[in-house]
Amino acid sequence: MIRAALVLICFAGAAMASEDIPDKYPQSVLYNKPVEVIPHVFTAIGATAPPTYENAGHNNNLSFIVTGDGVIVVNSGASYRLAEALHAEIRAVTDQPVRIVVNENGQGHAMLGNNYWIGQGVPVLGHVDAAAEFEKSAGQSLASLQNYARENAEGTVPMGPTETFTDRHVIEMGGVTVEVLYLGPAHSPGDTQVWIPEWSMMIAGDIAFHERMLPLFDNTCTSCWIETWDTAFAPLNPTWIIPGHGHPTSLAQVTRYTRDYLLDLREKIAVHLDEGGDLTGAYYVDQSRWSHLDTFDELATRNAGMVFAEMEFE
């Protein structure tokens, strides 16, 4: 535990914004080399930036758990090549085979690498809602990947998970109990968390953001996200959190940059609505408190418009 605490202290001290760093691991298609967060749990930290040619779409966290009888991977990555590169890093750490891949949601950067793992004979698990979302959006996600990643998109063929779950799927492997959870509505349909109670480690997926501004989608319910956080996610009280985006950190930090941001934006939009404000004015509500976050310039006004549309008829 002392080692893990030191790791997180190092992350906190070195967690400079990576939005302006095109690539931290140029010898690999991965943006970052995987690091061991606590013993047996590794993550390759993605760029806190939009997907680009330089980061090859590795802008989320790709994690893996090494047990005594195999490896559990969380996220297949945004492409065949990213999945292949992560597998090479896993092989450098352990001789244990990959037994299962868990997709954290139905977005391209979680599922577009599935065909690599399926080709390796590895089962891929995803939430039923995430699988349905990917089925609808896979073509657009692939086209986007091909546009920005160019040759790094080669080999990628959209494939959904081979197995689905609804609320909870327990993996017993090598003396470790891993709970794959759907705690409730959050960032996108089927957002999934991977919880290791014995180690108090949460691989949170996109329910939790750190260091970058979270994006809101047309199907994001911010009030639901806050409720899921307060009633299901926070009560688990994990010591260690690997968020969907950003460096591993604490519950307090992801609460600040996820739940507290959502509450603050909803409060600002509520005041704007009470004063008779319209959509155009909503784009200019004061979000300066969050201006230090990566992707603020790309997302702040868009998020304000999304919350206005959500709250206008609440």
Residue ranges, per PLM feature:
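Divalent-metal (often Zn2+) His-rich catalytic cores of metallo-beta-lactamase-fold enzymes
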Residues: 195, 223-281
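Conserved beta-strand hairpin/beta-sheet module of binuclear metal-dependent hydrolase folds
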Residues: 38-89, 194-196, 200-205
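N-terminal signal peptide c-region/cleavage motif recognized by signal peptidases
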Residues: 12-14
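C-terminal regulatory/interaction regions
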Residues: 28, 274-314
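Active-site neighborhood of phospho(di)ester-bond hydrolases with catalytic His/Asp-centered motifs
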Residues: 74-76, 99-106, 125-128, 183, ...
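Sec-dependent signal peptide recognition
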Residues: 1-8
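Active-site HxH/HxHxD metal-binding segment of metal-dependent hydrolases
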Residues: 88-163, 167-170, 189
